[in-house]
Amino acid sequence: MKRTYQPSKIVRKRRHGFRARMATTGGRKVLTARRSRGRKRLSA
């Protein structure tokens, strides 16, 4: 059986990276929420 998590740096950055978050309204809301919570890392 193939495992669900097949790590890839490129896919990780494209899907969850800062640029991907900034590209959509919802993504920007995610960043705002994470900033307000004082997260050390905003995105992948």
Curated annotation (Swiss-Prot):
Gene3D superfamilies named among the record's database cross-references: 1.10.287.3980
GO BP terms in the entry: translation
The keyword Acetylation is assigned to this record: no
Key words of the record: Ribonucleoprotein, Ribosomal protein
Molecular function, one GO term: structural constituent of ribosome
Gene Ontology cellular-component annotations: ribonucleoprotein complex; ribosome
InterPro entries, A to Z: Ribosomal_bL34 (IPR000271), Ribosomal_bL34_CS (IPR020939)
Entry-linked Pfam families: Ribosomal_L34
Domain of life: Bacteria
Classification via HAMAP family: Ribosomal_bL34 (MF_00391)
Family: Belongs to the bacterial ribosomal protein bL34 family.
Name of this chain's protein: Large ribosomal subunit protein bL34
Naturally occurring in which organism (per UniProt): Brucella anthropi (strain ATCC 49188 / DSM 6882 / CCUG 24695 / JCM 21032 / LMG 3331 / NBRC 15819 / NCTC 12168 / Alc 37)
